[in-house]
Structures are given as structure tokens and as C-alpha cells.
Curated annotation (Swiss-Prot):
The gene is rimM. Residues 98-170 form the PRC barrel domain. The lineage of its organism: Bacteria, Bacillati, Actinomycetota, Actinomycetes, Propionibacteriales. GO terms for molecular function: ribosome binding. Its main location: cytoplasm. This is Ribosome maturation factor RimM. InterPro entries: PRC_barrel-like_sf, PRC_RimM, RimM, RimM_N, RimM_N_sf, Transl_B-barrel_sf. Binds ribosomal protein uS19. The PRC barrel domain binds ribosomal protein uS19. It is found in: Cytoplasm. Belongs to the RimM family. The keyword Cytoplasm applies.
């Protein structure tokens, strides 16, 4: 039986150095920071496939501070600044909660209205303070749709589609036409 290929997923970006021992501040880009940056976890630098093994991590003033076994001093930490950190995951690995979705599984899904008419595709997911927002490409125009059940009643990853409520102007090319 053929093994399934893995998918590279961004989990963080290295910010500034913290202290003299090689610790770095990580801008978290994952819903599972404690698992992805727990002691013993391994991440890679995007593009280089260089492994970094977490030896310490802690939260301080809302920032994740991480020490990697391969980085011994501040100079090594400074060299990592700006590096994007990735992990390999199974492509069909989904959250346990049926109402949660990984961004990578939503990108590219076809967006249809309640009548089934194709309206565009999910381009990205923005994580805002109030709620997540879908960026939907409609004929080359980006439309922002709050990712809430009232506006997005159905998400069917298996069939590759999302249903968006038919609110006038929400996905219209020219919002003025909806008035």
C-alpha cells in the first residue's frame, strides 16, 4: 500500500532574539502552539529542511519564547530572525471538532450560494479578534465574509465546497448594484 505524502504547514515565524542563550520570540501561526513548540518537538526552517528541536518554551507577556537545541547563542538566534517554521502533517488530518477546520483545508474550496450557484473560491482565512474571516475570490475581486454559521451555514471539505448565505452585496462584484 502506498504511503500518503505529507503537507508542509507553517506554524510560526522567528522574530527577535531573546537573551544571550539563543532563545527566540516566535510569532505563532498555529492553533496548537503547545504541541508544535513543546519540549522535544521538531520544526523545520522553510526551504532549507533544517531541523530545529525545541528544548525549552514558555509564554511571556503574550509572546512565545523558544529555545532550540541547534541554537547555542544570541548570534545563532539573530541568524534565524525572519525564518518561517514549518512541520509536515498528514494531508487529511482534521481537528477532532467537526466545526473546526484547518486553513489549508479551506483554501481553494468552491464557494456557492444557497441556490448552488458557484460564486468564487476561498483564497485565504484571516484570524481576527472577533472571529475568523474568509477571503473569497469572486471574479478577481476579494470579498471578506465573517466565518460565522449565519453567513456560512455549510462547510463540506470532502466535496470541496462552502455554502455562503445569499445576503445582497456580500459576494456581488459591484456592491452598489445590491442597493
Amino acid at each position: 500500500m502506498e504511503e500518503s505524502a505529507t503537507v508542509e504547514v507553517v506554524v510560526g515565524r522567528v522574530g527577535r532574539a531573546h537573551g544571550l542563550r539563543g532563545d527566540v520570540v516566535v510569532e505563532v501561526r498555529t492553533d496548537e502552539p503547545d504541541a508544535r513548540f513543546g519540549v522535544g518537538a521538531t520544526v523545520q526552517i522553510e526551504g532549507s529542511r533544517r531541523d530545529l528541536t525545541v528544548v525549552r518554551s514558555r509564554w511571556a507577556k503574550g509572546c512565545l519564547i523558544v529555545a532550540f537545541d541547534e541554537v547555542k547563542d544570541r548570534q545563532g538566534a539573530e541568524e534565524l530572525r525572519g525564518s518561517v517554521l514549518v512541520v509536515d502533517v498528514e494531508p487529511n488530518d482534521d481537528p477532532d471538532d467537526p466545526d473546526e477546520f484547518w486553513d489549508r483545508r479551506l483554501r481553494g474550496l468552491t464557494v456557492v450560494d444557497e441556490s448552488g450557484k458557484s460564486r468564487g473560491a476561498v483564497k485565504d482565512v484571516l484570524h481576527m479578534p472577533a472571529q475568523d474571516v474568509l477571503v473569497i475570490d469572486v471574479s478577481g475581486e476579494e470579498h471578506l465574509v465573517p466565518f460565522v454559521h449565519q453567513l456560512v451555514p455549510t462547510v463540506d471539505v470532502a466535496s470541496g465546497r462552502i455554502v455562503v448565505s445569499g445576503i445582497p452585496g456580500l459576494l456581488d462584484s459591484n456592491a452598489e448594484e445590491a442597493r
